[in-house]
Amino acid sequence: MGFMAMMVSWPAIAAAFIVAASLSSPAAMRASAAAAARGGGGNNPTAGFAKVDLTGGDFQVQRPYDVPESRRFRYRDGVWTFWVYDSDKPFNTATHTNPRTEVRLRGHDYSSGVWQFEGYGYVPSGTSGVSVMQIHNEEGAEHATILMLHVYDGVLRFYDGPAIESNIYDRWFRLNVVHDVKASTVAVYIDGKQKFSTNVIPSESYYFKFGVYMQHRDWSNCMESQWTNVTVYTKSY
């Protein structure tokens, strides 16, 4: 009887493993976050925004100049995977900036209105001392960025300052970053909830970046992030 009971239970056990695996997939994470946003009503940060049409050519990959793209970047089944090593070269020979593998969203630079970046991100444990998302100013601006989201030891931070979200490792999270150009403010949402906002120094124009960009302290030997369903939204005043 015990043996038969054990035999009967194996299908249930296998099904449980399949369900657990599916819940950790990007598609399941997107569905869960979307359902939460619908249930939250006013908690959906994209409400009232219009979706911007993006094409494959809008996603410009920047990676260490001396290695093939395939050795630092992969796009598979709708997921962008970025990784870089602390010993890597900059993304071109004209700069002395830190190593990076990032996407620069091109063709959608902006200078007015309210703009929003949305993406579902994943940072594996061990990755530290890295920026995973930026709002970059125009080339040659006095300040390079108005927002950088850094990861240090599992905590997502505004630059290397205020903590935005703890325990960021090894889970899919929905990130929304809203930039109001006229008001010179940015707000950060995690899984549909506002976690941070601040005033920023205005510039002439802006664009979004995401991936991995090594910072100046507490970096790991290898830095990685994954992204899916990256979307840009905008609205006028």
Whereabouts are the PLM-identified features?
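Cleavable N-terminal signal peptides of Sec/SRP-targeted secreted and luminal proteins
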Residues: 8-33
